[in-house]
């Protein structure tokens, strides 16, 4: 679990996302409250439930990016899903319980990787020993008089082994091919099952996965690849699968985060008809999950009482009040994200850690083409992106991708001809490349 303070979390998010201070603060406090709850004594700890968040804002302003970056900072099981993927129980499609099943799978993988890191050093030593056994078959003296020289043979063998171990660690044997016996990976089998029968389907899938497991096969690999395969195999042997499952379930129950995107698409609109029953059904199915229930998974029963839910939606056609009242009450913290201004676009282009300008400079530098963006060029790019958003469909920061891609189309295509050159991107260059398209509304609708 992350022990970062809210200010530190916001500072990390600021490196990748421009503006949206209220949303950043809300998720930072929610994440910190997970840690605070763990410090509270047990009887009261069980009563403290997370305060779920509803993020409201147009597309492309950073809702999903905040969730994605939060996942990396949280060091906790995290899943992002679209609410539109789910249908009411009884309809064809996925039911909402599969959210928890997917989350526990992520947690098991995460926990397994964490536990494997703890034993990796020991596993690497054992993998080295297995490779050295193949490279240096033990010389056992046989016949009359063998015992008299046995000690000398062992000493010589030990010295040779240490020499080879040193060369192995220095990477001098990486390209040497060896034959070795490795365990066959378990082959997964995709089985389709009727709605509501996910547990049975999962059991059948597990049964087929175990068939043939544990068998060894002889493979020819380079030493470098063999070392990785054997290290993973040895680390896997050291793990206690039951312990991994128990820790994974506990991690989901105490630290799990679910990001529900496009929640506005399952909101019921009074004037609409048709699919309203199914939409309301999905909302009602979500209720117990968000409030706290117990879901049966192949790893055991999982309680959702302390899982944090973050929902987001543009709410262009529907309003948050169109959600059923019970579900509205499960998301007490609401934050509105602002539409992006020209200044925001300018900051997105240059101020973030992995800004678009830095990305394109790095890409073209691989072909010895150097891009230099002047301040007036950056400003003009931001103005054009903002203008196209206003005239056509507002897709937020994603508009910058289409604008800058169109701007650098010719340079990227003929990069080989520009090798060793520096391309200056100023306002005049931007106008030459984009002005005609940006000013023609019909063209910009299709090109930008």
Curated annotation (Swiss-Prot):
Membrane spanning residue stretches: none
MF annotations from Gene Ontology: ATP binding; ATP hydrolysis activity; peptidase activity; proteasome-activating activity
Gene Ontology CC annotation, any one: HslUV protease complex
Cellular compartment(s): Cytoplasm
Key word Lipid metabolism present: no
GO biological process, one term: proteolysis involved in protein catabolic process
Amino acids binding ATP: 18, 60-65, 261, 326, 398
Chief site of localization: cytoplasm
UniProt keyword terms in alphabetical order: ATP-binding, Chaperone, Cytoplasm, Nucleotide-binding, Stress response
Subunit structure: A double ring-shaped homohexamer of HslV is capped on each side by a ring-shaped HslU homohexamer. The assembly of the HslU/HslV complex is dependent on binding of ATP.
HAMAP family on file: HslU
Protein function: ATPase subunit of a proteasome-like degradation complex; this subunit has chaperone activity. The binding of ATP and its subsequent hydrolysis by HslU are essential for unfolding of protein substrates subsequently hydrolyzed by HslV. HslU recognizes the N-terminal part of its protein substrates and unfolds these before they are guided to HslV for hydrolysis.
PANTHER family assigned to the protein according to its UniProt record, in alphabetical order: ATP-DEPENDENT CLP PROTEASE ATP-BINDING SUBUNIT CLPX-LIKE, MITOCHONDRIAL-RELATED (PTHR48102), ATP-DEPENDENT PROTEASE ATPASE SUBUNIT HSLU (PTHR48102:SF3)
Membership in a protein family: Belongs to the ClpX chaperone family. HslU subfamily.
Name of the molecule in the record: ATP-dependent protease ATPase subunit HslU
Species of the source: Paraburkholderia phytofirmans (strain DSM 17436 / LMG 22146 / PsJN) (Burkholderia phytofirmans)
């Amino acid at each position: 679990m992350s022990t970062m303070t809210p200010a530190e979390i916001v500072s990390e998010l600021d490196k990748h996302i421009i503006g949206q201070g209220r949303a950043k603060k809300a998720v930072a406090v929610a994440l910190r409250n997970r840690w605070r709850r763990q410090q509270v004594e047990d009887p009261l700890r069980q009563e403290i439930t997370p305060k779920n968040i509803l993020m409201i804002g147009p597309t492309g302003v950073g809702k999903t990016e905040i969730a994605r970056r939060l996942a990396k900072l949280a060091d906790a099981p995290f899943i992002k899903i679209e609410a539109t993927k789910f249908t009411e129980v009884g309809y064809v499609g996925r039911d909402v319980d599969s959210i928890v099943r997917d989350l526990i799978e992520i947690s098991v993988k995460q926990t397994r990787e964490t536990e494997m890191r703890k034993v990796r050093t020991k596993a690497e030593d054992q993998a080295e020993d297995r490779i050295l056994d193949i490279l240096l078959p033990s010389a056992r003296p046989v016949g009359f008089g063998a015992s008299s020289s046995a000690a000398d043979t062992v000493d010589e063998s030990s010295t040779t082994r240490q020499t080879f171990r040193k060369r192995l660690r220095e990477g001098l044997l990486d390209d040497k091919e060896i034959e070795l016996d490795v365990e066959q990976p378990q082959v997964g089998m995709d089985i389709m099952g009727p709605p509501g029968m996910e547990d049975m389907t999962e059991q059948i899938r597990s049964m087929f996965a175990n068939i043939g497991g544990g068998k060894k096969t002889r493979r020819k690999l380079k030493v470098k690849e063999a070392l990785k395969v054997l290290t993973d195999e040895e680390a896997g042997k050291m793990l206690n699968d039951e312990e991994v499952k128990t820790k994974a379930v506990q991690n989901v129950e105490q630290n799990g985060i679910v990001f529900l995107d496009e929640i506005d698409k399952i909101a019921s609109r009074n004037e609409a008809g048709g699919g309203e029953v199914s939409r309301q059904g999905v909302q009602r199915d979500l209720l117990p999950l968000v409030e706290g229930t117990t879901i049966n998974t192949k790893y055991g029963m999982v309680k959702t009482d302390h899982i944090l839910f973050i929902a987001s939606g543009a709410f262009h056609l529907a309003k948050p009040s169109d959600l059923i009242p019970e579900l509205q009450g499960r998301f007490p913290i609401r934050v509105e994200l602002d539409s992006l201004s020209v200044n925001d676009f300018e900051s997105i282009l240059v101020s973030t850690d992995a800004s678009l300008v830095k990305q394109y400079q790095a890409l073209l530098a691989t072909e010895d083409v150097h891009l230099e963006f002047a301040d007036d060029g950056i400003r003009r790019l931001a103005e054009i992106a903002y203008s196209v958003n206003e005239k056509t469909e507002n897709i937020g920061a994603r508009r910058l991708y289409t604008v800058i891609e169109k701007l650098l189309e010719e340079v990227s295509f003929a990069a080989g001809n520009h090798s060793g050159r520096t391309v200056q991107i100023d306002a005049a260059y931007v106008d030459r490349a984009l002005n005609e398209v940006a000013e023609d509304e019909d063209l910009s609708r299709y090109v930008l």
